[in-house]
């Protein structure tokens, strides 16, 4: 195998696939990237057996062939080597040479026949989406993915294509049982499916698509395939049933307050310094045009903040995890946050006045 390619092109392809590599894997070949040169194209493959990322580029190939090299070593060499045209040459089955000008590097190889490939033959239900929109939907929900492995079905992002009011939408949903994030997109595409995408795959999808324009998505009962420009992600799904998230959405939260997002975030950020109990609890009091936050008891609080708001509904006193609140408010881009309460003991609904995303947060006892 021998080919020449510019550093820029090779580094971009390597950067795309490198995230799939499991650097501490006990199977040596899974720490490697597979390189395959044929038909004037070079294909790169990386996998941890759950996710496979491939990328390809066109270049001048002198000799077709394939091999696998240690991913991080190869990536670091290409990243640090000067700009220019790089020559890649498989000298023998066990040694790959990298040349650019007067620079020479040789790295050991593993037989490509040992490299596993995840099949995508059974994937159907393909839809095309705006990549920037999907990346934003992921950003607004992935923070709520659970790390609790005992409830493995919450360890991923629920991707739900469904019909609502004679229209078709795509929802991204995540919850850890303490908070839930939901983002919605009108697609108009008559496809219905519900899949749980693993957390690592979600991060890789977002990383790869966020600087592109269009993305193609195909799913089956057990896999998802994302195609974006010259990069393809194939991943296994979480085998489980995501809880009926629509039943979590509060229906009777009629005590509504609008707050400046930056003011609320800054107050929470300050007051959370002293919210150091198990739940990082902050008490919220809402009454007579006042939105108050405090840590500690009512008589002698450790920290207290007060914001002026327009509010004349029922008095509300509730407690929330300050970190969870900050995580949610950080996802809101508009100037105002809308918080809807039922009472002090029920979940609160948080949204932006003109957003397609909403958030639910459970109260904590104070």
Show which residues each predicted segment covers.
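Structural preference for solvent-exposed beta-strand-turn elements
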Residues: 1-366
